[in-house]
Swiss-Prot record:
Membrane-traversing stretches: none
Originating gene: purC
Enzyme category, top tier: ligase
GO annotations of cellular component type: cytosol
Family: Belongs to the SAICAR synthetase family.
Known pathway: Purine metabolism; IMP biosynthesis via de novo pathway; 5-amino-1-(5-phospho-D-ribosyl)imidazole-4-carboxamide from 5-amino-1-(5-phospho-D-ribosyl)imidazole-4-carboxylate: step 1/2
Catalytic activity entry: 5-amino-1-(5-phospho-D-ribosyl)imidazole-4-carboxylate + L-aspartate + ATP = (2S)-2-[5-amino-1-(5-phospho-beta-D-ribosyl)imidazole-4-carboxamido]succinate + ADP + phosphate + 2 H(+)
Keywords attached to this entry: ATP-binding, Ligase, Nucleotide-binding, Purine biosynthesis
One GO-annotated biological process of the protein: 'de novo' IMP biosynthetic process
EC number: 6.3.2.6
Keyword ATP-binding: yes
Protein name: Phosphoribosylaminoimidazole-succinocarboxamide synthase
CDD domains, per the entry: SAICAR_synt_PurC (cd01415)
One Gene Ontology MF term: ATP binding
Amino acid sequence: MQKQEMLYKGKAKSVYETEDNDLLILHFRDDTSALDGKRIEQLARKGVVNNRFNAFIMQKLADAGIETHFEKQLSDDEVLVKRLDMIPVECVVRNFAAGSLVRRLGLEEGQALTPPTYELFYKDDALGDPMVNESISISLGWATDAQLAKMKELSHQVNEVLTALFDAGDLILVDFKLEFGVFHDRIILGDEFSPDGCRIWDKATKKKLDKDRFRQSLGDVIEAYEEVASRIGVPLS
């Protein structure tokens, strides 16, 4: 499968057309961003680590019966995926309080959330990815009620699979975001799952092992990603 015209360049990935209209190629770059893209740096090995991490997670989800856009890994930093008509909202599942939830509600970071919370955010960097709800999403034509219900169902299924996976590596899956799209009238999981889009802490020390290391200038960002990968069994070589 050969890359053709670049369709889209995001903050950390580039999307390319292929000769098959149903398939795209994602290129994972070394770019790392924060503050809605206002701060961007290059971190060596990041594209390779995130591509392999994502491929591993997508396969685990597929093995659990969750349909994703993942087709196959093409190279160290490229993957073949189904072309989805993306729904412009992010689904965020939180098992513990962190990030914007702490700031909005004055919660203590690390407070357990039982049951896990589920939120929707409109994907728009210029607006700061504002929080929205199902009613807004339906009224503005972003998704149907049935599609939103399926996204919520799948998000909680993903949480069940991945909390167990990370727990086995003595890690806490604090929260994560997912993006979904439509493929031949089916809602399936798109985008990626990597430490860029979730929070992961060491179970014993609560050490942050995710993109918060970049956001908060803690250092050793890729080393943390590689540690997580090693502890859950991601093959990095």
